[in-house]
């Protein structure tokens, strides 16, 4: 079954297309990698899939529904996004940042329970950063932040996971660990 369908999409900013007539489909369990030069539109495409950047032409369907017709909460429940960089100055703990990934499911102002905390610590452990759980976000390195954001996305258990240059800040060992984790998701 088709999870994501992009049909004849043209996208960009202020009527200036970055990408024109893009079409592809992805089935559940598919791993797809977008390759291209810096500035060619990879991030713009992902942000359009998220519904953040409107299409100039065409359509994007998630489970056969136009993305733009889904509520913010429906999109957040179905799609997890890890940006290239996240510079927050917040003093939240890493565990709290990962738990924020559950907000679309449990509610933005709900207090995560024991079950949610267990899910979050499992993701931190999978990525080899459980030891960072109590560290403050604003004290982390770029690679540590990237891994924490990936853990936050994984704890959501989304139907679609969008990762924008997920390994760019990671050392070789964590790159391998990330790829292993993603391969396990496919199965």
Residue ranges and their predicted role:
Residues 35-37:
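The feature captures the beta-strand-to-loop junction immediately N-terminal to the Walker
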Residues 114-132:
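Conserved ABC ATPase "signature" region
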Residues 161-165:
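Catalytic Walker B motif of ABC-type/P-loop ATPase nucleotide-binding domains
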Residues 50:
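Helix-to-loop junction immediately C-terminal to a conserved catalytic motif
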Residues 136-140, 144:
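Conserved ABC ATPase signature
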Residues 157:
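Conserved catalytic motifs of ABC-family nucleotide-binding domains
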Residues 58-66, 75:
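Conserved ABC transporter NBD signature motif
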């Amino acid at each position: 079954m088709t999870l994501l369908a992009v049909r004849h999409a043209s996208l960009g900013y202020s009527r200036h297309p970055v990408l024109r007539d893009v079409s592809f489909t992805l089935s559940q369990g598919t791993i797809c990698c977008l390759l291209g030069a810096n500035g060619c539109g990879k991030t713009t495409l992902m942000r359009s899939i998220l519904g953040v950047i409107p299409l100039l032409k065409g359509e994007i369907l998630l489970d056969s529904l136009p993305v733009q017709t889904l509520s913010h909460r429906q999109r957040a429940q179905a799609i997890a996004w890890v940006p290239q960089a996240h510079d927050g100055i917040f003093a939240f703990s890493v565990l709290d940042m990962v738990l924020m990934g559950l907000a679309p499911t449990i509610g933005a102002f709900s207090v995560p329970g024991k079950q949610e905390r267990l899910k979050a610590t499992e993701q931190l452990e999978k990525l080899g950063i459980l030891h960072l759980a109590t560290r403050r976000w604003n004290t982390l390195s770029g690679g540590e932040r990237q891994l924490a954001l990936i853990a936050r996305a994984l704890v959501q258990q989304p139907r679609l996971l969008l990762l924008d240059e997920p390994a760019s800040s990671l050392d070789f060992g964590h790159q391998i660990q990330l790829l292993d984790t993603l391969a396990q998701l496919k199965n």
